[in-house]
């Protein structure tokens, strides 16, 4: 269902100048919550941006009626530290520092240099490039350095 929602709202969000990072539908305290997270290619995602996107996509979602039950719409920034789960997440996080854990228990920190639909390339501290298929990744998380 979230894939249908994503397909419906992605173009609208892009027409406003922002990028759709993720859509998730969760149940919290007996209430359905539809979370839409954004990336602003020109800087931070402000509260005004979240409100603007919410006001545009809310009526669209109501008309499409993808979610039968009542729900709360939450629009937010994708966040500074987040787990990368899909090729899209990797592509929208290029240039960021990440912590990588592989299925074989190897782990390292690197800069995410490139990503496609099958793998991601990481620049290690010695500037070597390590290419890893998504199937070999256990967890990849962005790191924010204070």
Curated annotation (Swiss-Prot):
It comes from the Bacteria. InterPro entries: Ribosome_maturation_RimP, RimP_C, RimP_N, RimP_N_sf. GO terms for cellular component: cytosol. The keyword Iron-sulfur does not apply. Signal peptide: none annotated. Transmembrane segments: none annotated. It holds the Pfam family RimP_N. Required for maturation of 30S ribosomal subunits. This is Ribosome maturation factor RimP.
């Amino acid at each position: 269902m979230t894939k249908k929602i994503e397909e419906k709202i992605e173009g609208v969000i892009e027409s406003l100048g922002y990028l759709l990072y993720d859509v998730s539908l969760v149940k919290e305290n007996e209430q359905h919550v539809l979370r839409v997270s954004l990336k602003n290619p020109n800087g931070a995602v402000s509260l005004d941006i979240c409100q603007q996107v919410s006001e545009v996509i809310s009526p669209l979602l109501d008309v499409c009626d993808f979610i039968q039950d009542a729900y709360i719409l939450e629009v937010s920034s994708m966040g500074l530290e987040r787990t990368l789960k899909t090729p899209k997440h990797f592509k929208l996080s290029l240039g960021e520092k990440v912590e990588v854990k592989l299925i074989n228990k190897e782990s390292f920190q690197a800069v995410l240099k490139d990503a496609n639909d099958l793998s991601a390339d990481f620049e290690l501290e010695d500037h070597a490039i390590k290419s890893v298929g998504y199937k070999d990744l256990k967890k990849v998380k962005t790191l924010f350095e204070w």
